[in-house]
Amino acid sequence: MNFVEELTWRGMVHTMMPGTEELLAKEQVTAYLGIDPTADSLHIGHLCGVMMLRHFQRCGHKPLALVGGATGMIGDPSGKSQERNLLTEETLRHNVACIKKQLAKFLDFESDAPNKAELVNNYDWMKDFTFLDFAREVGKHITVNYMMAKDSVQKRLNGEARDGLSFTEFTYQLLQGYDFLHLYETKGCKLQMGGSDQWGNITTGAELIRRTNGGEVFALTCPLITKADGGKFGKTESGNIWLDPRYTSPYKFYQFWLNVSDEDAARYIKIFTSLSQEEVEALTAEHAEAPHLRVLQKRLAKEVTVMVHSEEDYNAAVEASGILFGNATSEALKKLDEDTLLAVFEGVPQFEVSRDALAEGVKAVDLFVDNAAVFASKGEMRKLVQGGGVSLNKEKLSAFDQVITTADLLDEKYLLVQRGKKNYYLVIAK
């Protein structure tokens, strides 16, 4: 498999230094990609870079995932409009450990293969590097004129914020450049990959290597992922879509991919899955014949959810989706854990009732009219129940004066009332 050809048909090549493809064709190459450890989880904005490393390893080359323990303590100005908060060493070590665990789902760190993946942390070689060492070994090789010409620097200096660029952030490109030099000298690393906003930092590293020891190295960047409507990829109203289920439940993760537009699904299925070109072309053709069936979105959501979480989490997410949008049973509803239940019914009207009252038993008509205003009046509720239009926990309410107790609670806390086909209400016992 040819790595550059693989990335090209997937739409994952933005800029490539001349000679990169020739280098990859003649030898097993070691390449690295930097990951910012400012959180203890990756989010889907990291996924394109991680998939580059995955394809790189599958093509027989050796991937290095560099977590910027040192550079993360400073913050990269590329694409940023303001200074970043600095992280403590303890926080960074925790974040790095969590990120490695997530990367292990995409990369082979364990085998004896010569191209097994490695995780490196630039804090390990920067922590004892004094400022005088840095000035002598790195600073003297790159001119301020060269550094000032970078887009990331110019954008901050001329930006609307008018708060300039700190010396700390200005030197970031030299620190990242030194990473490339260090990995070139210690690991034989000849290629750096990253997002297109990293091109300036990557070429600084290549220039540093050329000026210090005459070495020739290469660079390849992927496009920054966007949405067809111009919105920011990977962001929702509630923030990032994280890979860690503590921050984004597998159900919400699955729903994100399931709900992308047709245009985005056609691009994302190439970038975020390992499906072959033939499989993608077949799915795209099938989708074009019946777009309403959302074949691309369903397959995209399946592939990414299984890869990031598990087959079990994917199946649970599909089942949970059916509860809101299909004819699910009460058994399926009872199987949901609390986090998924709340994720599925996020945004539906919620009411609180007394747990003590439920312990003694309350007539449904009193509970859902007086205690929780699900219905406007007892007469309205009686009429709907008689017409079979009210369900409790996905089972038809048999009588409007049926007694409800704590035994009816889901997860010992919730009652799900359904009025008609589409109106849901969540009643919480407190």
Curated annotation (Swiss-Prot):
GO terms for biological process: tyrosyl-tRNA aminoacylation. Its EC number is 6.1.1.1. A motif ('KMSKS' region) lies at residues 232-236. Keywords: Aminoacyl-tRNA synthetase, ATP-binding, Cytoplasm, Ligase, Nucleotide-binding, Protein biosynthesis, RNA-binding. It is an enzyme of class 6 (ligase). A motif ('HIGH' region) lies at residues 37-46. GO terms for cellular component: cytosol. L-tyrosine binds at residues 32, 172, 176. The keyword Nucleotide-binding applies. Pfam families: SYY_C-terminal, tRNA-synt_1b. It catalyses: tRNA(Tyr) + L-tyrosine + ATP = L-tyrosyl-tRNA(Tyr) + AMP + diphosphate + H(+). GO terms for molecular function: ATP binding; RNA binding; tyrosine-tRNA ligase activity. It is found in: Cytoplasm. ATP binds at residue 235. Signal peptide: none annotated. Disulfide bonds: none annotated. Residues 362-429 form the S4 RNA-binding domain. Catalyzes the attachment of tyrosine to tRNA(Tyr) in a two-step reaction: tyrosine is first activated by ATP to form Tyr-AMP and then transferred to the acceptor end of tRNA(Tyr). Homodimer. Belongs to the class-I aminoacyl-tRNA synthetase family. TyrS type 1 subfamily. This is Tyrosine--tRNA ligase. The gene is tyrS.
